[in-house]
């Protein structure tokens, strides 16, 4: 990417192609997709089921390799990196939030949020302080000793958000994070996400079917015939 440092997006997808084989047929999901994600900007990915939303997020988040094309993270190409190198980038630069919270049931909210930092080898005192700070920011200061089964759906998802940003990532990917929530709770969780984007200047790409929530994002994009298109 021949740009000045100030012009480099946090994540840039360049000519991404991804195909799957079903029996004797080849299904092209992404076909030359391009997308730039900038610091402090929220982007909604709105597209029908089966259009490639999750595939795009997995490729952008280095969970899956494209068949062709390149994924740049802070200007550095990643597709030729080893699995260990890609894992390290995911741990330091990338956060994920899913439709299902995926919290560890045997651990408290605090311990779940501490986990990504502990994996990186940070001191326990540092991880406790950071986890408490994030949970308090998300309105969960009085719930830190509760296990997932003792939390409401909205609280569980806010803990998942806290865990995703525990390592201060550069980019946050969210795949239908409010899909299992009622409208009121979904609104609360969505506000928490967008507030974090502005407060931390993280880039965010969120796949959602909720057009009302998507309308509050800085940008809206879709997938048509395997390519990314900007929406009004």
From Swiss-Prot:
Domain ABC transporter: 11-231
InterPro entries: AAA+_ATPase (IPR003593), ABC_transporter-like_ATP-bd (IPR003439), ABC_transporter-like_CS (IPR017871), ABC_transpr_LolD-like (IPR015854), MacB-like_ATP-bd (IPR017911), P-loop_NTPase (IPR027417)
Keyword Phosphoprotein: no
Membrane topology designation: Peripheral membrane protein
UniProt-listed Enzyme Commission number(s): 7.6.2.-
Keywords in alphabetical order: ATP-binding, Cell inner membrane, Cell membrane, Membrane, Nucleotide-binding, Translocase, Transport
GO cellular component: plasma membrane
Binding-site residues for ATP, renumbered to this chain: 47-54
Recorded GO MF terms: ATP binding; ATP hydrolysis activity; transmembrane transporter activity
Domain of life: Bacteria
Entries under SMART domains matching the protein: AAA
Compartments it resides in: Cell inner membrane
GO biological process: lipoprotein localization to outer membrane; protein localization to outer membrane
Family under the similarity heading: Belongs to the ABC transporter superfamily. Lipoprotein translocase (TC 3.A.1.125) family.
Function statement: Part of the ABC transporter complex LolCDE involved in the translocation of mature outer membrane-directed lipoproteins, from the inner membrane to the periplasmic chaperone, LolA. Responsible for the formation of the LolA-lipoprotein complex in an ATP-dependent manner.
Assembly behavior: The complex is composed of two ATP-binding proteins (LolD) and two transmembrane proteins (LolC and LolE).
Protein known as: Lipoprotein-releasing system ATP-binding protein LolD
Naturally occurring in which organism (per UniProt): Rhodopseudomonas palustris (strain BisB5)
């Amino acid at each position: 990417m021949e740009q000045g440092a100030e012009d480099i997006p946090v994540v840039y997808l360049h000519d991404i192609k991804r195909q799957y084989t079903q029996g004797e047929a080849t299904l092209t999901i992404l076909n030359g997709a391009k997308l730039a994600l900038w610091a402090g900007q929220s982007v909604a990915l709105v597209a029908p089921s089966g259009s490639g939303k999750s595939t795009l997020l997995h490729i952008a988040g280095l969970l899956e390799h494209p068949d062709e094309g390149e994924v740049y993270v802070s200007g550095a190409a990643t597709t030729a990196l080893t699995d260990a190198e890609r894992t390290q980038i995911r741990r330091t630069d990338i956060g994920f939030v899913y439709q299902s919270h995926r919290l560890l049931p045997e651990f408290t909210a605090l311990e779940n949020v501490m986990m990504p930092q502990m994996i990186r080898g940070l001191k326990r005192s540092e991880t406790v302080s950071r986890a408490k700070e994030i949970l308090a920011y998300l309105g969960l200061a009085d719930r830190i000793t509760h296990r997932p089964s003792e939390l409401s759906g909205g609280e569980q998802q806010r803990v998942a958000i806290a865990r995703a940003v525990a390592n201060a990532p550069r980019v946050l990917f969210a795949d239908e994070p409010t899909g299992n929530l009622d409208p009121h709770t979904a609104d609360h969780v969505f506000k928490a996400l967008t507030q974090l984007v502005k407060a931390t200047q993280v880039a965010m790409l969120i796949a959602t079917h909720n057009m009302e929530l998507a309308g509050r994002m800085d940008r809206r994009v879709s997938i048509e015939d395997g390519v990314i298109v900007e929406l009004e």
